[in-house]
Amino acid sequence: MSMSSTVIKFRAGVCEYNEDSRLCTPIPVQGEIEIKPNEEEELGFWDFEWRPTEKPVGRELDPISLILIPGETMWVPIKSSKSGRIFALVFSSNERYFFWLQEKNSGNLPLNELSAKDKEIYNKMIGVLNNSSESDEEESNDEKQKAQDVDVSMQD
């Protein structure tokens, strides 16, 4: 499958993250993430955009546009969230963005349990971010662990 035919789109909201309290607060707005190859496609870069799909009440929410560089960016499930499925987009600069998945879980899955569809999205994201050489395997596992240990408490 050539990269240029790959566009990943899924429903997700954005979270506010407070560095001091380490609280992650989902903003109650429907949104969408779209990831597609950047024009520097031969370098393996990807364009990432989150945008609200409805008008937020009482606040401005701008789209978030980022460039994903394989090997420099990770998509990490946040294990400490009990009331939702939260992922962090973590850059090697330690910049991070938090998103909550908005596809309804079918059946009786716990709120924080990834559905088959979520796992598919996760695997696609990992595929996008890993099409680089795996030379610094050690370091990246460390980083993953660090990101997962962020205390995320959902404010309902």
Swiss-Prot record:
The modification Phosphoserine is found at residues 133, 135, 140. The modification N-acetylserine is found at residue 2. One of its GO terms (cellular component) is proteasome complex. Residues 128-156 are annotated as: Disordered. It is found in: Cytoplasm; Nucleus. Keywords: Acetylation, Cytoplasm, Nucleus, Phosphoprotein, Proteasome. One of its GO terms (biological process) is proteasome-mediated ubiquitin-dependent protein catabolic process. It comes from the Eukaryota. GO terms for molecular function: ubiquitin binding. Belongs to the RPN13 family. Present with 12200 molecules/cell in log phase SD medium. Component of the 19S cap proteasome complex which acts as a regulatory subunit of the 26S proteasome, involved in the ATP-dependent degradation of ubiquitinated proteins. Component of the 19S cap proteasome complex composed of at least RPN1, RPN2, RPN3, RPN4, RPN5, RPN6, RPN7, RPN8, RPN9, RPN10, RPN11, RPN12, RPN13, RPT1, RPT2, RPT3, RPT4, RPT5, and RPT6. The 19S subcomplex associates with the 20S proteasome subcomplex to form the functional 26S proteasome. This is 26S proteasome regulatory subunit RPN13. It comes from Saccharomyces cerevisiae (strain ATCC 204508 / S288c) (Baker's yeast). The gene is RPN13.
